[in-house]
């Protein structure tokens, strides 16, 4: 046990345009090399493109996309005796969001559109319709957990 006090979680400041903490977190996931203003431009442009293509609000589509990418279970490696088992575990809510955002950004970076804003917009639209690489990643993780359900009793 640490002798010092337990450090609490930092409060994240909402983004300046939509006043959303979720969007602020997403901007931080997109950001590279500390270039936050560039990340904000990319996100806001992507949200504008998404709002043009769909008649829903910006944040509704982002929320729908993240909902469809969030994993409920994942596998963790657990060494028992001489062998390593992939043990299915439930994912905590904070980690669910983090994984969903990370997978959405990774999938967007692999797409072929011209700019990152267009890639991200395309991936968000696909994810909101339960298609795309990020949703496939979630399904792969769920399939892996389902396949290793026999090792669930090794949970810790």
Curated annotation (Swiss-Prot):
The keyword rRNA-binding applies. GO terms for cellular component: small ribosomal subunit. Keywords: Plasmid, Ribonucleoprotein, Ribosomal protein, RNA-binding, rRNA-binding, tRNA-binding. The keyword rRNA-binding applies. Belongs to the universal ribosomal protein uS7 family. Part of the 30S ribosomal subunit. Contacts proteins S9 and S11. This is Small ribosomal subunit protein uS7. The gene is rpsG.
